From Swiss-Prot:
Pfam families per the UniProt record, alphabetical: D_CNTX
Protein species of origin: Phoneutria nigriventer
Sequence similarity: Belongs to the neurotoxin 03 (Tx2) family. 06 subfamily.
Signal peptide positions on this chain: 1-17
Keywords for this protein: Disulfide bond, Ion channel impairing toxin, Knottin, Neurotoxin, Pharmaceutical, Secreted, Signal, Toxin, Voltage-gated sodium channel impairing toxin
Protein's recorded name: Delta-ctenitoxin-Pn2a
Entry GO MF terms: sodium channel regulator activity; toxin activity
Length: 82
């Protein structure tokens, strides 16, 4: 009985570990895509979605990713949509 409980515990841990590893791989791919997009001089999108909420949309230029307050980025984004 103890052997069966030990075996089932190991099996549950193995399945949980595999699930966590798959989630980690998905997250790494997503982060890599975001970092790559932010490092390139791409045309400014209306939503600046490449930069997330920290984007400053420069009209006629690339989407510049920088740290800052959300409402400043939103104001810059609104000016670009004119």
């Amino acid at each position: 009985m103890k052997v069966a409980i030990l075996f089932l515990s190991i099996l549950v841990l193995a399945v949980a570990s595999e699930s966590i590893e798959e989630s980690r791989d998905d997250f790494a791919v997503e982060e890599l895509g975001r970092a790559t997009c932010a490092g390139q001089d791409q045309p400014c999108k209306e939503t600046c979605d490449c930069c997330g909420e920290r984007g400053e949309c420069v009209c006629g230029g690339p989407c510049i990713c920088r740290q800052g307050y959300f409402w400043i980025a939103w104001y810059k984004l609104a000016n670009c949509k004119k």
